[in-house]
C-alpha cells in the first residue's frame, strides 16, 4: 500500500511505464526513488529534473517494509540482485498494476483501453479535463503527472498479459478490439474475453466505438454508450469538415447537438477519439465550452503523428505497427499533405506479428507511393523467427529494404511526406535520415 511516510522504491525505474508512475507519485507528494541498469536512457531525464534519485541495481538499496514500499517492474525476476534481496530479507513488493489501481481508487477515474488509439485518446482526455479541473494522468508514451487534490485520474489501460484487469475504474473508453499480442493471447476469443472482464470491472459507464462488433457484443450491468459516425450511435460526430489544418465537426449526444468542436489533428480516427472524450466529459457534466477550448490547444501525443518540416520534405514519426493503425496514419498523412508524394518507412514489430499480418502489411504498403521496410524489430520475448523484411518487400512492387547503411537512399524522395512507423527502435532510422537533411 502506498504510504507518504515511507520511501516508494522502484525496481526498474527507467522503464517507460515505471518512470511515468514514479513521476506521478512524486507529484502527488510521495518520497520516490529507484534503480535500474546503468545504461543512460531518455526516461531518466524528467526523473532527475525533479530530484528523483536514480541508482544502479544494488542489494543494499533494499531495506525493509517498515521503511519502503517496493514497486517491482514486470521484467525483473529472481536473478535481479534487488529482487533476490527482497526474497532473502522477506521484503514484499507490489506490481505496477497494483500501484496504479491504488491511484484509480483515489479519484474519479477513466481508463482508456483498446488495441489502437489508447495513447492518443488518453493524451487528449487528460489535456481537456486538465483545463477544467485538477487532473492526474498516466500515459503509455512515458508521460505521467500527478496533481495534489486532483479530481480526475486518466490512465492508459494495457491489455497485454491482461494487465488492465488490475483496475476498477469509474469509466472506461474502449476504442476497438482487433486481435493483437499473438505471443500471449491464444486467439480472438481469448483476446476479446480480456475486454469483457475489463468491462465487468468498470463501475459507472462504458464508452465503445459503435462500429466494432466485438465491443457491441460485450455484456454489462452499467450503461454502455456507443460513439461514432452512425445515426444509431449515442454520441455521433456529424457535419464533418476536414482540411490541411485539422477537422471541425458537431457532436450529437443522444440526439442533442452539443455544438461544433475543432481539433488540429488528422484522420477519422482522431475525430472518433475526440468524440469518445466528449462523451465522457458530457456524462461527467463537464461544461462543453471548456472541452471546446481544450480541444483547440491540444497538440497531439508523443510519437503519434509527430511532424517535422525540412523544406520540401515533411517527416512524420508514428508508433503505428498494426494494420489498423497504419491505415489510420496513412489516411491522416494524405489529409495533411494532399499534394506530396507519400513515402513510408516501416519497421515490422516482432516476428509473430509480422507473420500474422504479412498480407495486410503488403496490401497497405502497395498503396503508398514508395515503401521501405527495415529489418524486423525483435522483442526480448522473441529473438528470431522464420520471416524477414525481404519476404515482405518481394510482394510490394518498387519497395526496398532499408537499414542504417543505406538510409541516404531516402533523400531521393523530393516533395515528399516521409512517414516513419513502428513500435521498436525506428527513431534511430529517422534520426540518421534527418542528419542528412
UniProtKB/Swiss-Prot annotation:
GO terms for cellular component: cytoplasm. It is an enzyme of class 6 (ligase). GO terms for molecular function: ATP binding; UDP-N-acetylmuramate-L-alanine ligase activity. Pathway: Cell wall biogenesis; peptidoglycan biosynthesis. Its EC number is 6.3.2.8. GO terms for biological process: cell division; cell wall organization; peptidoglycan biosynthetic process; regulation of cell shape. InterPro entries: Mur-like_cat_sf, Mur_ligase_C, Mur_ligase_C_dom_sf, Mur_ligase_cen, Mur_ligase_N, MurCDEF_pg_biosynth, UDP-N-AcMur_Ala_ligase_MurC. Keywords: ATP-binding, Cell cycle, Cell division, Cell shape, Cell wall biogenesis/degradation, Cytoplasm, Ligase, Nucleotide-binding, Peptidoglycan synthesis. It catalyses: UDP-N-acetyl-alpha-D-muramate + L-alanine + ATP = UDP-N-acetyl-alpha-D-muramoyl-L-alanine + ADP + phosphate + H(+). Pfam families: Mur_ligase (PF01225), Mur_ligase_C (PF02875), Mur_ligase_M (PF08245). ATP binds at residues 114-120. Belongs to the MurCDEF family. Cell wall formation. HAMAP family: MurC. This is UDP-N-acetylmuramate--L-alanine ligase. It comes from Lactobacillus helveticus (strain DPC 4571). The gene is murC.
